């Protein structure tokens, strides 16, 4: 029974819901009014009933006409880049841009074809002495040269054995009487001498036995004078030999040398300024090299080549510019200047040097050059 009542109530409720839905649908389609919503007959028919409950929501109506477009919203965030599209057509050529910076230098190109030879330039100054080259192969023997000039007198040799007695010489001139010597001890009686000067007559004696005739004696005074002259000559020779030997010892301090004629050029291989070089040679009993002929210049050149150093000569023009003289003041009797020399370059070249090619050049005296002395 109770179940029946509940079922009826549910059905009634559903009926009211459908009715309400129909009314809402109708109200949306027609203009609502107080009469249509509340009353179905005139007011005079009776009192209005109580408001019923809202019915169930009716079915969804048809889609209405589109409304007016709303205002544009704000731009959203940019999306991700899309895929690259196909290449477009080439645009028109633009105006040239500003000049760019200079790029790095490229690698050097191959050498070009040699150009034609230029004109020969002027002759340059003589360069410095180069290093001594290696000795070349030994050449063939040349023709025999001329006999050279006699060399200097050599030092005295050792005393030889006594030679055989020579022939009697011619009596010399009478010398001055010498001083009386001290009386010597009595010697063995010699042979009878020649008769002395006649003495004063004595008392007449008894006649004696005649003696044997003695040999004729030699004259004394001429022989003494000759011996004195010989001794003096020997003393001079000894003095000359002593001086020569003393100079020879000094010369031997210079190990390298060349002789020509009566001259010897010597060097010890060291270099000095002109004034000091001059002093070294003077103390050794000589002077700086002073070649007075082509032969002497060639001999000096051999020393310069062996040492591979230019050497000072003794000549200067310190007294008169351009006029070179020997240390004695004499003018030059021989010269072998290089082309364009002397030129007094810099206004201070008052001394002379000799190169390995034998040519001369004026040089400042303060420079250091090889010391070569002449004896």
UniProtKB/Swiss-Prot annotation:
User: Where is this protein localized, as stated in its record?
Assistant: Secreted, Extracellular space, Extracellular matrix; Secreted, Extracellular space, Surface film
Q: Which residues carry this modification: 4-hydroxyproline?
A: 78, 96, 171, 177
Modified residue S-nitrosocysteine is at which positions? 35, 40
Please give the positions of the paired cysteines in each disulfide bond.
281-373, 351-365
Stretch list, region Disordered: 43-221
Q: Pfam families, from UniProt?
A: Collagen, Lectin_C, Surfac_D-trimer
Glycosylation is annotated at: 90
Where does the record place a coiled coil? 223-251
Can the keyword Calcium be found in this entry's annotation? yes
Q: Locate the 5-hydroxylysine modifications and list their residues.
A: 87, 99
Q: Which domain of life is it from?
A: Eukaryota
* Annotated Low complexity bias: 116-132, 138-150, 173-189
Q: Where is the C-type lectin domain?
A: 260-374
A biological process from GO: respiratory gaseous exchange by respiratory system
- Residues of the signal peptide: 1-21
Q: Which UniProt keywords apply?
A: Calcium, Coiled coil, Collagen, Disulfide bond, Extracellular matrix, Gaseous exchange, Glycoprotein, Hydroxylation, Immunity, Innate immunity, Lectin, Repeat, S-nitrosylation, Secreted, Signal, Surface film
Question: What remark does the entry add?
Answer: Pulmonary surfactant consists of 90% lipid and 10% protein. There are 4 surfactant-associated proteins: 2 collagenous, carbohydrate-binding glycoproteins (SP-A and SP-D) and 2 small hydrophobic proteins (SP-B and SP-C).
UniProt subunit comment: Oligomeric complex of 4 set of homotrimers.
Could you say which protein family the record assigns here?
Belongs to the SFTPD family.
Sum up the protein's function in the record's words: Contributes to the lung's defense against inhaled microorganisms, organic antigens and toxins. Interacts with compounds such as bacterial lipopolysaccharides, oligosaccharides and fatty acids and modulates leukocyte action in immune response. May participate in the extracellular reorganization or turnover of pulmonary surfactant. Binds strongly maltose residues and to a lesser extent other alpha-glucosyl moieties.
Q: What is this protein called?
A: Pulmonary surfactant-associated protein D
List the source organism.
Answer: Macaca mulatta (Rhesus macaque)
Q: What does the organism's lineage look like at the top?
A: Eukaryota, Metazoa, Chordata, Craniata, Vertebrata
């Amino acid at each position: 029974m109770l179940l029946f009542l509940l079922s009826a109530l549910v059905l009634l409720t559903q009926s009211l819901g459908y009715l309400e839905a129909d009314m809402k649908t109708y109200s949306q389609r027609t203009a609502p009014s107080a009469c249509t919503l509340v009353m179905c007959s005139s007011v005079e028919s009776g009192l209005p009933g109580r408001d019923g409950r809202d019915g169930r929501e009716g079915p969804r109506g048809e889609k209405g006409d589109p409304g007016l477009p709303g205002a544009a919203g704000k731009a959203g965030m940019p999306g991700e880049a899309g895929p690259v599209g196909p290449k477009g057509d080439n645009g028109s050529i633009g105006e040239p841009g500003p000049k760019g910076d200079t790029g790095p230098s490229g690698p050097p190109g191959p050498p070009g074809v040699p150009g034609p030879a230029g004109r020969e330039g002027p002759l340059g100054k003589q360069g410095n002495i180069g290093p001594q080259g290696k000795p070349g192969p030994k050449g063939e023997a040349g023709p025999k040269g001329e006999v050279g000039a006699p060399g200097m007198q050599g030092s005295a040799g050792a005393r030889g054995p006594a030679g055989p007695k020579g022939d009697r010489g011619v009596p010399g001139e009478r010398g001055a009487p010498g001083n009386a010597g001290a009386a010597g001890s009595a010697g063995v009686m010699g042979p009878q001498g020649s008769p002395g000067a006649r003495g004063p007559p004595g008392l007449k004696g008894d006649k004696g036995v005649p003696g044997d005739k003695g040999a004729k004696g030699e004259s004394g005074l001429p022989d003494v004078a000759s011996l004195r002259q010989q001794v003096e000559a020997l003393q001079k020779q000894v003095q000359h030999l002593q001086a020569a030997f003393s100079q020879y010892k000094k010369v031997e301090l210079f190990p390298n040398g060349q002789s020509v004629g009566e001259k010897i050029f010597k060097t010890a291989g060291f270099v000095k300024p002109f004034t000091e070089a001059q002093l070294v040679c003077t103390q050794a009993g000589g002077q700086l090299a002073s070649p007075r002929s082509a032969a002497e210049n060639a001999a000096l050149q051999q020393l310069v080549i062996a040492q591979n150093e230019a050497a000072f000569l003794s000549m200067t023009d310190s007294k008169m510019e351009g006029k070179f003289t020997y240390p004695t003041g004499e003018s030059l009797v021989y010269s072998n200047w290089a082309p364009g020399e002397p030129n007094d370059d810099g206004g201070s070249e008052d001394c002379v040097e000799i190169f390995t090619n034998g040519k001369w050049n004026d040089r400042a005296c303060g420079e250091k050059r090889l010391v070569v002395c002449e004896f």
